[in-house]
C-alpha cells in the first residue's frame, strides 16, 4: 500500500469515498425523473385536462372522454401490477407513449423525450401520498399464450358467460349489457362499458395486454380482478374470444403487433361515449331540478 495513502488523513479520504459510492449507486439505479422539471412539462401539456391540483378538473375536462384521471388517490387503471396496487413508472410511461385508443388521451411518444416523460411521471406522483409510503407490488405473471383457434374462441365464449361479462359488455360485446347505463367509477362519474366490437382495445390488442386486465382488473372502475377465480386456460380462452369480436384483429396470428386503427374508428368511439354520457348527464340534471 502506498505510504502516501497511509499518510492521508481519514477526514480527507471519507468524503471522497462517500462521493464514489453515491456515484456508483446512481449509475446502477433505475432512471428517476425530476419532479421540478416535470412540473414544467405538466403545466404545458397536462394541466388543461388533469388540472393544476391533479384532480382531473382542468379547463378541458368536461369536453374529454372519459373524464381525465384524478391523480390524488394514486388509482390507475392501466397497470402491470395486481388489483389495488400502484402502477410502476414503466406503466405510466407506457400510457404516455401509446396513448389510450378511443379516448382523449393521446400519445406523447414524439412530443416528449424519454427524460421528459420520466420527469412528468415524477411530478404526477407528488399528487398522491401513496407514492411516498407504498411501492408497486410485483408485476402480474403471464403464462405463455396458447394458439388462437376456433376451439379456444368457443371455449372463451362460454367463459364470457360464466363470469357474467355480458352483464356490462352485452351478449355480443357491444357494451350494452343490462348494467351498462348504471355504472359509475370511484369518483361517481358515469362510466361506459367498452364496446369490444369497436376494433381496438384501449390497453392494446395483444393477448398479454388483455390477459392482464382480467387478472389485474381496472382500479377505480367496476371492472374487477378475476385473479382468484379464473384459471390461466380460461383467461387465455377469454382473451381469444374478445379478440374474435374485433373486426380488425388478425385471426391467423397470436399476439404480435396489431394492425393500424380503421379510419374514423377513434372518432366513432368518442362520439358514442359522448352521446351516452350526455344522456346520463341530462337525466341527472332533470332529477336535480325535481
Where are these regions (language model features)?
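N-terminal secretory signal peptides that target proteins for export/translocation
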Residues: 1-11
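Serine/proline-rich low-complexity intrinsically disordered segments, especially terminal tails, linkers
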Residues: 4-5, 21, 71, 277-281, ...
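Bacterial N-terminal signal peptides
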Residues: 11-24
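Electrostatic cytochrome c docking/interface patches
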Residues: 25-41, 131-161, 200, 249-255, ...
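Flexible, glycine-rich phosphate/dinucleotide-binding loops
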Residues: 55, 77, 114, 174, ...
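Flexible gly/pro/ser-rich segments immediately N-terminal to CXXCH heme-c attachment motifs
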Residues: 36, 40-41, 87, 107-115, ...
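Extracytoplasmic electron-transfer domains, predominantly the class I c-type cytochrome c fold
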Residues: 62-109, 117-124, 182-245, 287
Amino acid at each position: 500500500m502506498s505510504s502516501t495513502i497511509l499518510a492521508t488523513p481519514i477526514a480527507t479520504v471519507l468524503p471522497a469515498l462517500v462521493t464514489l459510492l453515491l456515484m456508483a449507486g446512481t449509475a446502477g439505479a433505475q432512471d428517476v425523473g425530476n419532479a421540478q422539471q416535470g412540473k414544467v412539462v405538466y403545466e404545458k401539456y397536462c394541466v388543461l385536462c388533469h388540472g393544476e391540483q391533479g384532480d382531473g378538473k382542468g379547463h378541458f375536462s368536461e369536453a374529454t372522454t372519459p373524464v381525465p384521471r384524478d391523480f390524488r388517490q394514486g388509482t390507475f387503471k392501466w397497470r402491470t401490477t395486481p388489483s389495488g396496487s400502484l402502477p410502476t413508472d414503466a406503466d405510466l410511461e407506457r400510457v404516455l407513449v401509446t396513448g389510450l385508443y378511443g379516448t382523449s388521451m393521446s400519445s406523447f411518444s414524439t412530443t416528449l423525450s424519454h427524460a421528459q416523460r420520466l420527469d412528468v411521471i415524477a411530478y404526477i406522483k407528488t399528487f398522491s401520498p401513496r407514492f411516498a409510503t407504498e411501492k408497486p407490488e410485483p408485476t402480474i405473471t403471464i403464462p405463455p399464450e396458447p394458439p388462437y383457434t376456433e376451439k379456444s374462441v368457443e371455449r372463451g365464449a362460454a367463459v364470457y358467460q360464466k363470469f357474467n361479462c355480458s352483464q356490462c359488455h352485452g351478449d355480443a360485446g357491444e357494451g350494452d349489457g343490462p348494467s351498462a347505463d348504471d355504472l359509475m367509477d370511484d369518483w361517481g362519474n358515469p362510466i361506459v362499458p367498452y364496446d369490444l366490437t369497436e376494433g381496438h382495445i384501449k390497453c392494446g390488442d395483444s393477448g398479454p395486454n388483455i390477459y392482464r386486465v382480467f387478472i389485474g382488473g381496472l382500479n377505480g372502475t367496476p371492472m374487477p380482478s378475476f385473479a382468484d377465480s379464473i384459471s390461466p386456460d380460461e383467461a387465455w380462452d377469454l382473451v381469444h374470444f374478445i379478440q374474435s369480436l374485433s373486426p380488425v384483429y388478425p385471426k391467423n396470428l397470436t399476439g404480435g403487433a396489431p394492425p393500424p386503427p380503421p379510419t374514423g374508428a377513434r372518432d366513432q368511439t368518442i362520439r358514442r361515449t359522448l352521446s351516452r354520457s350526455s344522456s346520463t348527464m341530462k337525466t341527472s340534471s332533470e332529477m336535480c331540478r325535481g
